[in-house]
Amino acid sequence: MQEYKELIKECAKELEGLMPEISQKLVNIAKINSPDRAFLEYLKVVEQVSLMKTERKQKNKALIILWRYGEALEKELYSDVKFFAKPLHKRIFRFVDWKIIGMLFLVFIILPAITSNLWSFRSEHYVLYLNENVDFPRELCNYRTSWLYDFRTSMVCVLKYGYGSINVTLRGNSWEKGVEAQRFISDMEYDFDRVKSPITYIQTPKETLRYKKGVCSDFALLVANILLDNNVSPVYIVHTVVRKEPSGGHAAAGIYVNGTLWILDWGSKPTKFQEYLENIDRIWEIREVRIYRITRDRITLERIYKARLEDDRWRFLYSVIIMLGIFILKRREWWIM
């Protein structure tokens, strides 16, 4: 029954150059006369090595040696093998597993959601004060195709030179007229089919009134036309340019009341400019907001709010995170370290 001592001594000798302190412990265990106690102490050594913080290859090699001799030791001492003779499951090579999928979800869904909330047009923009005169040759306004698809040119031909303008009488002060004009356009239908079209043309106020429907640019021109015709001057048109929007963005008319710019947009109540920006910012990624000041004889691009574009270096960071994450998750499976 002394064979178990010889097995432990052989294990100690094999570990002598790899882990001297563990080898010495095994030498001491080999002196124990009780087989059960010796086996129990051997198991404690295996556990100690598995929990050691040391170089991975060294630890793995030591565990392989301990496991091999432990299996032989258990067979020698007990007929019922249960500690070392468990079948090892074959490692299956998988390039993609749930850990990889979870990491990709974190990198491409969670992180962009967080960073998009951190970036906001309201906090990341600057203002250019231009007071730039906006004009277009009057004789060219006779040719509809010259301004049919350009909103800025359409403002000149419709609001300055009166092409396709209408006469609608409003009552009250400037605020009441603005509210009534906003209510007037909100009773019309929004032409979503035109929004989906790859090429969006501009309607005159007369056409919008005739069809009883339009898009944001049509309603902005209509409101500005009605208010100017009712001696509310100046009026403003706010043109918001957004990223990846086929129609080019959003337009709405506005008026100043008591020093505050109020936006008169289709389908909503009169809204303060800052609140309007917040609402747009939640829906689209704003690139710039152009403020046009309009009177009967002059249209001026008064100012532009321009976004400070986010840094694209995050794309490189994402790539590094992905490669590093795959390396960490799969290093054992690929036997990298």
Curated annotation (Swiss-Prot):
UniProt xrefs under Gene3D superfamilies: 3.10.620.30
Membrane topology: Single-pass membrane protein
Source domain of life: Archaea
Keywords: Membrane, Transmembrane, Transmembrane helix
GO terms under cellular component: membrane
Primary localisation category: membrane
Keyword flag Transmembrane helix: yes
Subcellular location: Membrane
Transmembrane segments: 100-120
Record's keyword annotation contains Transcription regulation: no
Family: Belongs to the UPF0252 family.
UniProt name for this protein: UPF0252 protein PH1321
Organism (species): Pyrococcus horikoshii (strain ATCC 700860 / DSM 12428 / JCM 9974 / NBRC 100139 / OT-3)
